[in-house]
């Protein structure tokens, strides 16, 4: 993927993530007199919202990092081995910072 296309896709992703994060950070559920079941449901919803916010924030960080790589000329190169990241991977995940092999190694270590 060329740098211009990558930048456009990444900037679009960043704008969408910023919108999503804004929605997820919206007003907390107002505390009212509720049944125990309703209160439990609110906690579950809050936990789910927090999990989605955590994922969106991490993805936003990856997109910002990818934009920095576009700026410094290293976009499309694996941050671990410096080999090219396959175009198919970048098409699917423009924010990808590692080739498939290095990403697999990283995930196995977790």
Give the positions of each predicted feature:
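Conserved RNAP core-binding helix
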Residues: 72-76, 83
